[in-house]
Amino acid sequence: FLNQSPQFYKQTAVAFFDRVFEIAPVYRAEKHATSRHINEYIGLDFEMGYIDSMYDVMAMETACLRYVMEYLKKHYAFELELLEADVPVIRDIPSVTLLEAKEILGNKGSKNKLDLEPEDEVAICEYAKKTFDSDFIFVTHFPSSKPPFYAMNSREDPRLAYKFDLLFRGLEITSGGQRIHDYQEQLDKMHA
């Protein structure tokens, strides 16, 4: 299989550099039959050390997106107008837990308890636009059985993980979370 991400190298490097950024080709090594995924793309990854919670990562992502959108509007106004691109204004990005998202969806949502299906993502983004006037929304606290083994389980409820997805206009555009930083805890989760 092709590597999807140098995840562990980045996590190791954080011990020395505090923040590690990478822009590189990503090759998906998973089966999927959807127009919502591509097998190869250029990805931007970052790891942060010495955080208190996944909300620190979400705040960093919000600030980064805000900067990029403002930069695009300032330096590429002609191109954006030519393409008739609608660049969103980013204030604070709202968040809901997966459980809250499922409650918002009610009977209209999918039966998948571990994740959101594409139609769920569209509906949650419509909710975010209507309720918060935001094109973006974070969905947090997925079941701990879903994310990769390096995602930290919630201290309040170990059945959940400190993991999030960022949705934008009906699509998941990023995912992230708080990593396990305790050696024994990591070993225990790997062996579970």
What are these regions (language model features)?
Residues 1, 18-20, 135-138, 172:
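Beta-sheet entry/capping signal
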Residues 1-49:
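Class II aminoacyl-tRNA synthetase-like tRNA-binding/catalytic domains
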Residues 169-192:
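Extended C-terminal subregions enriched in glycine
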Residues 45-56, 170-172:
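A generic structural motif
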Residues 57-61, 97, 182:
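Hydrophobic (often cysteine-bearing) scaffold residues that line and stabilize catalytic clefts
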Residues 13-15, 33-36, 55-58, 149-152, ...:
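Short conserved micro-motifs at the rims of enzyme active sites and ligand-binding pockets
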Residues 2, 46, 101, 139, ...:
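Conserved hydrophobic/aromatic pocket- or pore-lining residues that grip, position, or stack substrates
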Residues 63-169, 191-192:
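Metal-assisted phosphate- and nucleotidyl-transfer catalytic regions
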